[in-house]
Amino acid sequence: MTSILDRYLNTEKYQGVMRDFCNAQILNDKTKCGLFLKENVLSRIGWNAEVSAFPDAEEYEHTYNNGDSNKGLFFKTPRMVILHCGFRKDTTFIENSDKAGIEGIYPRDSFLYDDWEEKNPGKPSPYKRRRLILMFLVNKDGVAVHKKPLILSLHGGASNMFCDAYGTFIEQLESAFAEATGQKGSVGFDPKQSAAAIFTPTFGAELYGTSAKSWISYPKQWVVPTAKTITNFFPKNNEDIDFIEEVWETCPPSVYARPFFEQCEKEIGINAIRPGVDFNLAPINGGQGTKALLGARDADTGEITLD
């Protein structure tokens, strides 16, 4: 039976547009540590699941340090698929905390750290690395329970500890896969295979830092795969894996990062993008040779000048 809606499935005639992204938040609270989706986020992403579909999930009203509060859903043990930027080596963005702006991509623009040290010897660097994880929450069969992907924005200890946990989980999954398929050794997954892996962490809290410590939330433990249980760690149907792979292919960090930071600047006045920052170039290996390889940058525009 045809529907008037069928005409709008013609993607050559009706091309979709990218809307503003929605944030998932990690609550860095000693007693309430986990993932939080605000009520307005749930209404925008096409949320279609019951709270009971997730272990340790509940309706919750969170009060922030400034006194503002938001209702939403809290997940102590979210069931996630991480499409992009879940590994330590993945792309991160260099944020100047003094100017609340994005000034480069790490490791490509790691010369920014060298420049700061040269001009401000002995002073603490204002730069930190902002990580934008693209993710879905999924049900027990690996089906996404919302129509639009979420962005989880992390930095500092929360970013490091999340990536360490996720990276360990993927290596456990690779070993279980090798054993289940009769391979003598395990190899790293293709990124698209990792993107479909179901990561189910339970968050805990830890004091993090050197002199000024603060509470951060991190995946304290997670459901560990074995050769016998490995099929539970991927979506049950090929169509759902195809969907995840399609989003992985069509929405890399070079596509979603710039609009996300522009949205932050518009809504809360931070993370303005410095003129000249190119989100389209693939990151290259950083280190001492990066500055010489890329050449100097104009102090005002950030444009590269090659001698």
Predicted segments, located by residue:
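Surface-exposed polar/charged interaction patches
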Residues: 11, 24-28, 179, 250, ...
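Long, highly charged low-complexity segments enriched in Glu/Asp and Lys/Arg with interspersed Ser/Thr
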Residues: 84, 89-91, 215-298, 307
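Extended serine/threonine-enriched, polar tracts that run as long, contiguous segments within proteins
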Residues: 129-231
